[in-house]
């Protein structure tokens, strides 16, 4: 039995994207909506397409993504990470290309926690000398 789709999980900040790649015509769907509708910003749309454009597979696959958590920027980058991992599952020879572009690296930066005695993670309360 052959697999009908390739799967990849992408993460960024608190966003998680579960990505499935089906052989198709280049339709990208996020949470049941077209990606242009889900991410109206052109920069975020470009981020999502990057791995497919880089590997010249934009018109060869339909992408279905379920994304949750985080904000729009984190979600877009999580989707990019997920698509890259799914492409890797499809063809392991794409690893050097995707790795060089930095699409396989999980961006581990997260929000720093607030510390007690401070106003935020590093910001202090205003100091009054007198």
Curated annotation (Swiss-Prot):
Q: List the Pfam families.
A: Ribosomal_S9
Q: Output one GO BP term.
A: translation
Print the keywords alphabetically: Ribonucleoprotein, Ribosomal protein
Annotated signal sequence range? none
One CC-aspect GO term: cytosolic small ribosomal subunit
Q: Which GO terms describe its molecular function?
A: RNA binding; structural constituent of ribosome
Family to which the UniProt record says this protein belongs: Belongs to the universal ribosomal protein uS9 family.
Can you name this protein?
Small ribosomal subunit protein uS9
Q: Which gene encodes it?
A: rpsI
